[in-house]
Amino acid sequence: STPNTSRIKHFLTHKQFHLIQGDVTDSGSIYRCLNEVQPDEVYNLAAQSHVGTSFNQPNLTWNVTAQGCLNILEVIRDMGNRPRFYQASSSEMFGDQYNLYDKEKYQDEHTYFRPQSPYAIAKLAAHSATMLYRRSYDIFGCSGILFNHESERRGERFVTRKVTRYVADLYWATQEGRMIPKLQLGNLNAKRDWGHAEDY
């Protein structure tokens, strides 16, 4: 992973926490980590998760998000004591598709996938690999299709944090008699389901 630990610094010093650096794009790194720890469960949250960035860096997005998942699954397949595996999938896999049985309903497991970005394609590949390894190699693998989820640790490149950060900046600028640039957002017609990270 990247060396940025700012979002987990609150438990870095906890006596039961031991940070092991790894790289999902390097099978040897995954092998060393999993064989050192011998976990009961593995949660793959690794991804290059910015849709916009995925258009600028499709290879990086694929290598981390899709190939990284496959690398983890391959290491688990070769382990004697196989841990359970969870893949964090994304609602981006659906693209603009509706529920097959009722267009008024939200997307669910009956909705066709129609990815619209390199990120969504990579997530769909990881999702599909997890299903394949469950069926073909008898690995306990499952995926959760996550929609947008928010918390105080959400990066400031995401829309909710952009808006809340802008409101705070605007407040302080107004107090100090300063002007700040206008807030710039992307597609204002986009519809999303949001939840809190603790609910996931």
Q: PLM ranges: what are they?
A:
Residues 1-149:
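N-terminal Rossmann-like NAD(P)+-binding domain of SDR-like oxidoreductases, especially those catalyzing
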Residues 4, 97-106, 128-199:
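NAD(P)-dependent short-chain dehydrogenase/reductase
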